[in-house]
From Swiss-Prot:
This is DNA-directed RNA polymerase subunit beta. The RNAP catalytic core consists of 2 alpha, 1 beta, 1 beta' and 1 omega subunit. When a sigma factor is associated with the core the holoenzyme is formed, which can initiate transcription. It comes from the Bacteria. It comes from Streptococcus suis (strain 05ZYH33). Gene3D superfamilies: 2.40.50.100, 2.40.50.150, 3.90.1100.10, DNA-directed RNA polymerase, subunit 2, domain 6, RNA polymerase alpha subunit dimerisation domain, RNA polymerase Rpb2, domain 2. Its EC number is 2.7.7.6. InterPro entries: DNA-dir_RNA_pol_bsu_external_1, DNA-dir_RNA_pol_su2, DNA-dir_RNAP_su2_dom, DNA-dir_RNAP_su2_hyb_sf, RNA_pol_bsu_bac, RNA_pol_bsu_CS, RNA_pol_bsu_protrusion, RNA_pol_Rpb2_2. Keywords: DNA-directed RNA polymerase, Nucleotidyltransferase, Transcription, Transferase.
Amino acid sequence: MAGHEVQYGKHRTRRSFSRIKEVLDLPNLIEIQTDSFQDFLDYGLKEVFEDVLPVSNFTDTMELEFVGYELKEPKYTLEEARAHDANYSAPIYVTFRLVNKETGEIKTQEVFFGEFPIMTEMGTFIINGAERIIVSQLVRSPGVYFNDKVDKNGKVGYGSTVIPNRGAWLELETDSKDIAYTRIDRTRKIPFTTLVRALGFSGDDEIFDIFGDSELVRNTIEKDIHKNPADSRTDEALKEIYERLRPGEPKTAESSRSLLTARFFDPRRYDLAPVGRYKINKKLNLRTRLLNQTLAEHVINGETGEIVLEAGTVLSRDVLEKVEAQFDELNLVEYIPNDNAVLLEPVLLQKFKIVAPKDPERVVTVIGNANPAENVRTVTPADILAEMSYFLNLAEGLGRVDDIDHLGNRRIRAVGELLANQVRIGLTRMERNLRERMSVQDNEVLTPQQIINIRPVTAAIKEFFGSSQLSQFMDQHNPLSELSHKRRLSALGPGGLTRDRAGYEVRDVHYTHYGRMCPIETPEGPNIGLINNLSSYGHLNKYGFIQTPYRKIDRATGTVTNEIVWLTADEEDAYIVAQSTSPLDENNRFVDKIVMGRHQGNNQEFPADSADFMDVSPKQVVAVATACIPFLENDDSNRALMGANMQRQAVPLIDPKAPYVGTGMEYQAAHDSGAAIIAQHDGKVVYADADKVEVRREDGSLDVYHISKFRRSNSGTAYNQRTLVKLGDIVEKGDFIADGPSMENGEMALGQNPIVAYMTWEGYNFEDAVIMSERLVKDDVYTSVHLEEYESETRDTKLGPEEITREIPNVGEDALRNLDEMGIIRIGAEVKEGDILVGKVTPKGEKDLSAEERLLHAIFGDKSREVRDTSLRVPHGADGVVRDVKIFTRANGDELQSGVNMLVRVYIAQKRKIKVGDKMAGRHGNKGVVSRIVPVEDMPYLPDGTPVDIMLNPLGVPSRMNIGQVMELHLGMAARNLGIHIATPVFDGASSEDLWSTVKEAGMDSDAKTILYDGRTGEPFDNRVSVGVMYMIKLHHMVDDKLHARSVGPYSLVTQQPLGGKAQFGGQRFGEMEVWALEAYGASNVLQEILTYKSDDVTGRLKAYEAITKGKPIPKPGVPESFRVLVKELQSLGLDMRVLDEDNNEVELRDLDEGEDDDIIHVDDLEKARAKAAADAAAAFAAEEAEGKE
């Protein structure tokens, strides 16, 4: 027997064909959400408050300080928040201290700071009763970046940018004359030496001393001449910069100093964030630039004064490693700026002189920023000078330019950081308000409560959750789509890219995506490559860079250890990483002398002893959905992409089955998705039924798990959980208590395992269509339950309150038979389109009645005249069984919108069997539409009499190159015959030897094909056919949701043409090309009525309707409304536009509202006309009958 048994949870054993020993379990798959939010509560929120506060008033006599905060218990439970359309949020109380600096008085007070949405254990937020997800954002990291560009003459120029988290950008660039310029915040450029002089290094000699002698520096100094001898060079530079930043304002050196300080050196205006400081220190550190260069002078330790490295030494990796411990103390130089500088502190730089790589006769000066501490959140003069040095060194062939798509330069902003940014925005708005209140009010009686207005903060948070591009309605089709949505990474959103500006490079797969972002799972269409998914082992470090785990290789012994090292993309660039599929012996050493490995994007063979790390698992490359595709390695990447995306659209079935051929990922995906119920602690089941399970812990306390039955999911499917445990079962923490939707025995089960044959049948599976046996309909194999929610609310109107009632005017008793005494539908009633769900009447304005009418009205109380029917009815195309009714009223203490007195929600469940027009798919991107459902007796059958369930077109395989489906087919049949389940993990699954040996073990023929007999004739087909078991899923694109027909419906206001689309109950567009077709046929009458009555001839269509109901000839059509619109449009351009008839007489086009009243039938009149026509018709029919009897 090939393969080995593996246990998944307590309910499933699979035969696995994997060969690689997994040394690291998958992390919790939603930790990117939960960890980030927890981090925000523990540190992020506090940090934001400390950034903005303390705040002083304008006279600096009062100061408001932040002390701490506390989150109290949420107001609603999860279930209550869902039911009441409320937020699942907790009140937050912040303690402030108000200090009076004159009297020394301190007032401390706890202030209510609004309700803060809380993340559920599943990684979601409940906002207005609906589950939402905050998608993590992929953005360019703050830091310093260098680039090169080739101009039209083929000359290479260089550029550099310092990008902060917030604040002004500082750019450097060269021009065609080899002069270096700088730009501050995208303004006009100035020679870079001008900025150096403004920083207090004004002499040419000083500049040469700092940067060394190079052509770029010389050319720039020549350009930057001293124009005004009355000013010092620094003052002149400051004025020049001020003129660029604030053109037209009077320039003084003092105002320029304060402007530059505010722009770059004030922590409130400029923030690099810890990640920006880390990236700048890493880039401007000298180690990388000095590697393999030759020293031109001795290197001295600043503290001891000893010579550490002599001139002429080549700085190899080994040499640098020897001096690593003292490297930061070597060659430190302090420069003192002059008295007119922006900042007066001394500037500490690390300065080496090396032999120029391009010309051994010259010496190049290399400057580092001497590693400022991590808490220095602004840019420093040392950073600016070191950036300029790196920029000048690039022209000398030192250093290297950055690749912006490298994942070392892109980071993730997860939920916590996105929320912190929102709170910061709110607090900054609040701070302006605070200053004014502190200055205006009396200091003696001031308390924190009086001066703090929390509105800006709560508004910022509300806006973020309600309308940000990154706050999304959770995709809840099935557990996999939930999980994928939580792990999604979007490059769009505020501060990110836009679809139109993103080019091919940003969207493309980059070598650093390996193990960090899935190269396969991304949408097709305009967002391709901009929306990605985290790889299965991906994990964020404290700076937001994605790390991936590797096994460390002991270079001394050549042993692959089980020690796990997590590396970011730029750390990985320094190493050679071997593949996880490289064979190892029993001592964990490589079997082969040469192994396949990766280094900086090159996939090549390396000597085994040169590898530093090894992948932990073959599936670390791909995301969760992709890792659920068996034989992924045999599929073309485009089809694998479709397969991964379509699994997320699977509809939960009534009785789903886990795949015979899985990948072993199904258990983990179901466990972490949040859709199942997982035991929180060890214990024993003391009560279990369909609604709740109680587990007694060892310490005696009781855990109660509530099980959801047929709840409506965000996608309108049934969210139904099934209890898995029995009374008396012992459960351990992490065990399944209940399966969620699309799960079976603790594994994800998106579809079913039908018997599939690759064969044509009467042409019905042309173009990927699917032929299906009636068994799948009768036995409810692909039946799903869908829940739709309808609501009706009563409001107060000017004419009186609306009312929910059974007494509805002009409605027969038959239509009310399923309503209760209040006028609300009974639970369990079957309803069809047009049926009343909630009877509701609205008062309507009375025409002035005569005295007699008023008297009669008062005596008999004729209600029908004063109210109109506004009942909630089942919309077009919907039907089903009423599953639940919820009633919310103010009397019960429910929170309703203002003006609403009562809200009724009706849930209708619909059981949908599979039918012609529904979309089906396999896991390999093989999708198709059901074209015919054939009676079981007519389907082809196997020699043992088993009829086939599905027939697919064999022509769908070769051109699409997704051969994985054929391998799955054969292995699936073997698994069915053997009565086992199989796991074939991606890139480490069943080989063809395993496949054929399992086929042989199952007693199948050696070619895995079989003879099929035609169900209609009993004759065998000419050729042997591939028949097997393939996992097939029913997708969310169902024909019931798409089919649509319109008779009478709404029109667009301006053009008076029917609206478009099913949601608007619109018509089918008869476009330009369709008009050409009718013209080609010469069908002039058909054409005329399509362009007039059936479109936008307003009076014509009403008269036509009237003529049809009265049985009169249809009158001539009038002028289409769109023609009037065109006339008006031309008139609005100032053109004198008239319409002439054939005798050149002007035709007057009356506007609709000017037309004669006879021409226009109002809607009310139309209803009356319909009723009258119906009555007339009934009378005529009765008369005919009477005549017949006579």
